[in-house]
Amino acid sequence: MDSSYGATKFLLLLFLTTSIATALPDNKPVPGQINSNSVLVALLDSHYTELAELVEKALLLQTLEEAVGKHNITIFAPRNDALERNLDPLFKSFLLEPRNLKSLQSLLMFHILPKRITSPQWPSLSHHHRTLSNDHLHLTVDVNTLKVDSAEIIRPDDVIRPDGIIHGIERLLIPRSVQEDFNRRRSLRSISAVIPEGAPEVDPRTHRLKKPSPAVPAGAPPVLPIYDAMSPGPSLAPAPAPGPGGPRGHFNGDAQVKDFIHTLLHYGGYNEMADILVNLTSLATEMGRLVSEGYVLTVLAPNDEAMAKLTTDQLSEPGAPEQIMYYHIIPEYQTEESMYNAVRRFGKVKYDSLRFPHKVLAQEADGSVKFGHGDGSAYLFDPDIYTDGRISVQGIDGVLFPKEETPATEIKPAAPVVKKVSKSRRGKLMEVACRMMGSRFIPCQ
């Protein structure tokens, strides 16, 4: 009896334990959620304001939140002076360009280790650790001075939180991949090319090789005007692709046009312009061909608000989108600085456009560059959205149209002058003589 009672009690206790365990909520930590005591919150509120600003611009907060949810992290934070005054201005502008977002992210992730390393845990011998960018940092001790790569730790254990730690370092750490990207852009190696040479031609009369035409100096503009190199018309097929040859045979215009269209989309506010260039027309293909042949272009890109003001009548005519876009493309390489200096010096400047023979009028207004005439004018307000030495994109706040040419007043031809032959008048003496002599006098007949 006692044994059966004990078995029943055991089964009842087991049932209650299982029920309670099932009813309890699942309190497993959700990765990616951080609290106010996190090292990321401390970084954003710390005196490392320049680094925190770069983290926000690089769109890395969500990535770092996921990393903190999985493991502790160690952040090597450069002091503000290292990012403000001690950094090469060209390198800083390179990092802040929208098209170089991946380089900026790699640079910042290079400063973060997926583990917690305090100053007492610093290795006495040189030891390398993998960073969040999959590169390696070497931690060393040099005469009681902690170092990470070649940078000195000036504020060890500056910020300590349960999920991570921040060490202050004297300068920015630059990974080799980012340095190589910067060097390629600075030397224009990724967009430069060897001028192609034509195949030798044989003179059919002498059966000898024709003398080659004089060589064009490197970097000189193409011999043909850009209007002769354009495709015949918007109603015809798109312009053909560049001739055979590798990336060293011509400028890679297709890649550069694709790059600047991606920049427009990432920049924001120019989706309509990108859609017209790629989907509504074949201008993206034609621009790539022109750049491949050595021409340079400056695009005045209206923003989405300006494009929304276009009426259906303005876009419904055959070839209207192409003509509108042609008027916004200047066959020169101009930046915001060069155009502003020109209008400051000369007052008004007229730039050629691909909509021949119409020109784009530019003048200074309110400390900026104003394009167009009267109510149809537009201001340059997003300067240098994309500049790579071959293509320059400047954002404007209106759609430009060429000034309508007033027809000259028709000059009516003057009525032909009818000359009236006046009757010859005889002199008084002849008249008197006729009266006296009568009609028998021969001159009087």
Swiss-Prot record:
Family per similarity comment: Belongs to the fasciclin-like AGP family.
Function, in words: May be a cell surface adhesion protein.
Predominant localisation class: secreted
FAS1 domain boundaries: 35-173, 257-400
GO CC annotation terms, alphabetical: extracellular region
Gene it is expressed from: FLA16
Keyword tags: Glycoprotein, Proteoglycan, Repeat, Secreted, Signal
Disulfide bond entries: none
Highest taxon listed in the record's lineage: Eukaryota
Signal peptide: 1-23
Listed Pfam families: Fasciclin
Chain positions carrying an annotated carbohydrate: 72, 279
PANTHER family xrefs: FASCICLIN-LIKE ARABINOGALACTAN PROTEIN 16
Localisation per UniProt entry: Secreted
Name the record gives this protein: Fasciclin-like arabinogalactan protein 16
Gene3D superfamilies: FAS1 domain
InterPro entries reported in the protein's UniProt record: FAS1_dom_sf (IPR036378), FAS1_domain (IPR000782), FLA15/16/17/18 (IPR044654)
Record's keyword annotation contains Heme: no
